[in-house]
């Protein structure tokens, strides 16, 4: 079944969304000063490329949150290899079991869309300390008239996707201030799609039919043809 092929393709990928170590480092600097031992949540952590780096850079109490337990097992492996401690929690991001006012830094690279941008901003705000900060990356239209193929692809998976002005307005309505905005470079997409494309070829060599791989390959093909129409933007936010 297609879902099984999806998980086989995504097993052991270094990341589950566009990004890079350089981008994570930059966004952490843009987040500003944190307590000496901050409470950090990496929500929708995937296999933990940002989680482990955040633990190394902040020296904080870092927890990776994801619903897919094999991803969390990989987080634990990566943390052990890096000689840092990272907690893991299998939980839904729309019902995080943390006390109000307990989180200094909530990190969400490529995951807020799962519950929706506006819903994420509303649900996560009460968790923050008075000086807490949210760092997230969000898929956005960079064209007011994207190609029909790109529109059809994203409408199927994320029909609520907006432009940057639309998200900036939503952030203001939700009572947040924007500390920084950063558009992820093309190299960050390559970091995600390069390993995914290689994994697809491995599955093809193992005998998985092309028609079952097509759905996994589609997002790469759409990006190659219409990448100018959309991108990922990082927002560093504080409650007003």
Identify the meaning behind each predicted range.
Residues 17-36:
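Conserved alpha-helix/loop element of class I SAM-dependent methyltransferases that forms part
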Residues 41, 47-95:
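Class I SAM-dependent methyltransferase SAM/SAH-binding core
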Residues 94-105:
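A short acidic, Gly/Pro-enriched loop at the edge of an enzyme's catalytic core
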Residues 105-118:
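A short SAM/SAH-binding and catalytic strip from SAM-dependent methyltransferases
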Residues 119-133:
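A short glycine-rich, Lys/Arg-flanked "PGG" loop and its adjoining helix->strand segment in the class I
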Residues 139-158:
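Short, glycine-/aromatic-enriched active-site segment of Class I SAM-dependent methyltransferases
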Residues 160-175:
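Short alpha-helix
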Residues 182-240:
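Conserved Class I S-adenosyl-L-methionine
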């Amino acid at each position: 079944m297609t879902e099984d092929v999806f998980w086989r393709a995504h097993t052991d990928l270094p990341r589950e969304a566009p990004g890079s170590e350089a981008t994570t480092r930059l966004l952490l600097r843009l987040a500003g000063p944190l307590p000496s031992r901050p409470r950090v949540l990496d929500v929708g952590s995937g296999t933990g490329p940002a989680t482990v780096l955040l633990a190394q850079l902040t020296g904080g109490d870092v927890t990776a949150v994801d619903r897919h337990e094999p991803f969390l097992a990989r987080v634990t492996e990566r943390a052990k290899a890096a000689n840092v401690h990272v907690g893991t929690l299998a939980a839904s991001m729309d019902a995080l079991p943390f006390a109000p006012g307990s989180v200094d830094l909530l990190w969400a690279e490529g995951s807020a869309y799962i519950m929706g941008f506006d819903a994420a901003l509303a649900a996560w705000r009460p968790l923050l300390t008075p000086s807490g900060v949210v760092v997230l990356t969000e898929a956005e239209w960079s064209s007011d008239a994207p190609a029909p193929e790109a529109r059809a692809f994203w409408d199927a998976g994320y029909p609520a996707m907006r432009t940057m002005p639309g998200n900036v307005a939503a952030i203001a309505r939700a009572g947040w201030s924007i500390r920084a905005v950063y558009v992820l470079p093309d190299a960050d997409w390559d970091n995600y799609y390069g390993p995914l494309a290689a994994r697809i070829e491995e599955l093809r060599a193992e005998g998985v039919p092309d028609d079952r791989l097509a759905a996994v390959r589609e997002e790469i093909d759409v990006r190659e043809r219409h990448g100018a129409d959309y991108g990922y933007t990082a927002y560093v936010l504080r409650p007003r």
